[in-house]
Amino acid sequence: MAIIIAAPASGTGKTTITLALLAYLKAHALRVRSFKVGPDYIDPMFHAAVTGQGCVNLDLFLTDEPFVRATYHHHCRGQQAAVIEGVMGLFDGRAGQGDFASTAHVARLLRLPVILVIDGSGAGFSVAATLYGFRRFDPRVRIAGVILNRVGSERHAQILSEAVRSQGLELLGTVYKDETIALPHRHLGLVPVEELSDFRRTQQQLAALAERSFDWQKLLPLVAIQPTAPAPARWEAEPLPPVRIAVARDRAFSFYYQDNLELLAALGAQLETFSPLAGEWPDCRGYLLGGGFPELCAGELSAKTRFWEGLRGAVARGVPLYAECGGLMVLGEALRTPEGRSHPMAGILEASCWMGKRTVLGYRVATALHSSCAVEAGRQLRGHLFHRSRMEPQPGAPLWQLDDDEQEGWVRGNLHASYLHLHWGTQAWAARRFVRRCLAVAFEGKSTPARF
């Protein structure tokens, strides 16, 4: 079995509670796999930093039920425990579609118990009414217990525990307000773990918090994985000839879905990570520039001459480059930071990136208007947007037509650049197309030059 950590709403402390659970299990030398419901990148990076293994996203909009079931069972093989962190409130799904793609949807699909994290601050016995509603709203979702968070005092804890037990639920942990470990936030959520120099100390604090705050006699049987039947295949990925593909990974570029990287490897890609912030540019036959926060280190990045020369040269030669969000932001002529400073960037696209205050957020259905190194014109895909920047001017021949009547994305030869984050789990053809384009460079030593 495994457990799903959920809550009535966002902001209750799900991530901190999840990390504390993972840190305790890791400290006790258990092989633990973590998962995250939804499209988020930052929480999974914290999970991975604690467990030492990639965290896997379970997203029923970006993929589908058979894939989520298959990837869950695949990644549980050889593990001793598993913890899934939910997203938003337990029943919060895609806007306008009820609880579709919600944490509850995943719980029903995988038939896993839910532990509800309750924010006790400012509440007393009224918590019983909250639990009454959540327990009965959908009987197919089994709430196995409650962890109380941000509790004010022992007297407060007693009142809240009475509320929990009045609903026939197990109290699995109590975290007091003065013990809460706060993780730093900024404009798009948590500050990524790569930027926290003392996270190892934080991890130790989280493990200690879990040890003294949680009822492990009750929790351990819930998180322990039982042997299951062989997992169904996640995708049809007949290997292609090997080809070296470079993946940018540092403080500027770090947003990648674990399953996407594993799919590329299954197709024959030999993935090599590199750091643009260190001025690195490996000689490979394809490049991934993922999302991240290039705006926060734009000045440092702008000075990396070797990286820019390598990037411009590769695109000019037609080497496939797949850039998402943060990767797109650095391809224009300049990037204007939140403080208003403008820094020269690649100059590959005739546009510049401007940081704003409006967050563009949500799932999208996208139809490709033009072919790129990863998509064919006319193909429809599902993706996710999450950014506060904009590229101006907009492309004359955009890559995507989105279902909100917006158009976006750039395509030039073998360059694919877009704000849209894609999960290739049920769209393996896109990854295969990208690898084939990279192989064309490897075998022929050339490809179609990009024209601007």
Curated annotation (Swiss-Prot):
One Pfam match: GATase_3
Keywords: ATP-binding, Cobalamin biosynthesis, Glutamine amidotransferase, Ligase, Magnesium, Nucleotide-binding
Biological process terms in GO annotation: cobalamin biosynthetic process
Active site positions: 325 (nucleophile)
InterPro entries for this protein: CbiA/CobB_synth, Class_I_gatase-like, CobQ/CobB/MinD/ParA_Nub-bd_dom, GATase_3, P-loop_NTPase
Positions of the record's site feature: Increases nucleophilicity of active site Cys: 421
UniProt catalytic activity: cob(II)yrinate + 2 L-glutamine + 2 ATP + 2 H2O = cob(II)yrinate a,c diamide + 2 L-glutamate + 2 ADP + 2 phosphate + 2 H(+)
Cofactors required: Mg(2+)
Domain of life: Bacteria
GO molecular function: ATP binding; cobyrinic acid a,c-diamide synthase activity
Pathway: Cofactor biosynthesis; adenosylcobalamin biosynthesis; cob(II)yrinate a,c-diamide from sirohydrochlorin (anaerobic route): step 10/10
Enzyme class: ligase
Location of the GATase cobBQ-type domain: 244-429
EC number: 6.3.5.11
Primary role: Catalyzes the ATP-dependent amidation of the two carboxylate groups at positions a and c of cobyrinate, using either L-glutamine or ammonia as the nitrogen source.
HAMAP family to which the protein is assigned, alphabetical: CobB_CbiA
Family: Belongs to the CobB/CbiA family.
Additional observations: The a and c carboxylates of cobyrinate are activated for nucleophilic attack via formation of a phosphorylated intermediate by ATP. CbiA catalyzes first the amidation of the c-carboxylate, and then that of the a-carboxylate.
Description of its domains: Comprises of two domains. The C-terminal domain contains the binding site for glutamine and catalyzes the hydrolysis of this substrate to glutamate and ammonia. The N-terminal domain is anticipated to bind ATP and cobyrinate and catalyzes the ultimate synthesis of the diamide product. The ammonia produced via the glutaminase domain is probably translocated to the adjacent domain via a molecular tunnel, where it reacts with an activated intermediate.
Protein name, per record: Cobyrinate a,c-diamide synthase
Gene: cbiA
